Regions:
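Charged, low-complexity intrinsically disordered terminal segments
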Residues: 1-98, 102-317
Length: 317
């Protein structure tokens, strides 16, 4: 999808790691910018501390513009954690969106961040997240989501946050290294396109396999006030509630962290709608990367079963 881009790439991520897959994708984006594609990258600050050199270098390219969402006032070492403790209410509000939009015509949205553990390159862990590749009117919603966060008062130009641009020699080495890594193809499961023409050809093949159906994107806009919790229910929560209340045959849930309140479980429960089947797939204790989140789910597991919800837990292998 990067190689197929002709005009623009807008990418928004919670995590973009400075590892093999992160640098590979950064290199592909850099090569797109080299041929004139306008690139905007919006990254959450919480995981951006260790990748300053990579993105400070990319930000020097005339066709690449990078913003950081909700940055800490003190951005290095212990100072970052001091900021977290002193300004917890604001710093705890993170941007978990993962959106990738090309030319305003095709987009990818889902749960996958950019890092080796999300693409099967990490030997110790593998996060099996899902993405959806879409085109058509629903991509307008993806673009609107990106634009809302990009123009948010909480999105700061990366150039305002990094102390200085890399030295010329260091910058040249980093940029050339990224261009070379983009060609190297780090043990990919399939061969990647080698240019824009082949990229568009591969994308056309993917489009021929797509499911044609009505689609709607629901996203929560960036908050106006970071310092106080909102009393207004989020768009996504309301949309899920409407779907659950109107379901007549089946509800399928897949979530890494399945933590629901009692009233949400009652709304999902099939005991009052015998014809409704509800099934949920989540992590087991062995496959979960956050024990605290599993504990929050496990305490409600007996009640979920009482409500007629079938639960499936992912094995660690």
């Amino acid at each position: 999808i990067v190689d197929a881009a002709e005009h623009s790439i807008d990418a928004q991520y919670y995590i973009w790691s400075d590892d093999r897959s992160g640098r590979y994708l950064a290199g592909r984006i850099l090569r797109a910018a080299d041929r004139g594609v306008q690139v905007r990258l919006l990254l959450d600050d919480f995981n951006a501390e260790g990748i300053g050199e990579l993105f400070a270098s990319l930000d020097t390219h005339p066709n690449i513009h990078i913003r950081i969402f909700n940055p800490a006032r003190n951005r290095s070492g212990w100072g970052r954690w001091v900021s977290f403790l002193m300004d917890f209410q604001r710093i705890n509000r993170r941007m978990h969106n993962k959106t990738f939009v090309v030319d305003g015509a095709a987009g990818i949205v889902g749960g996958r961040n950019i890092g080796d553990e999300y693409f099967g390159f990490d030997q110790s862990r593998y996060f099996r997240d899902r993405d959806v590749l879409a085109l058509g009117p629903v991509v307008e919603g993806m673009a609107d989501n990106f634009q809302a966060y990009w123009n948010s008062r909480w999105a700061y130009p990366a150039s305002d946050l990094y102390a200085s641009a890399p030295a010329d020699t260091e910058l040249a080495e980093t940029m050339e290294g990224l261009r070379q890594q983009a060609v190297a193809q780090p043990r990919l499961p399939v061969s990647a396109p080698t240019g824009a023409e082949q990229g568009r050809s591969e994308l056309a093949k993917a489009f021929n396999r797509m499911t044609i159906a009505p689609g709607e994107l629901v996203f929560d806009p960036p908050p106006e006030n970071m310092d106080a919790p909102s009393e207004t229910p989020k768009r996504s929560a309301l949309a899920l509630q409407r779907l659950a209340q109107t379901a007549t045959r089946e509800i399928l849930i897949e979530s890494a962290y399945l933590i629901l309140a009692r009233e949400q479980l009652q709304a999902l429960g099939a005991t009052e709608r015998p014809q409704l089947e509800v099934a949920a797939l989540t992590n087991s204790l062995a496959s979960n990367d956050l024990v605290t989140n599993h504990a929050g789910y496990a305490r409600w597991r007996p009640y979920m079963l009482e409500q007629g919800i079938d639960i499936y837990e992912l094995k660690p292998d």
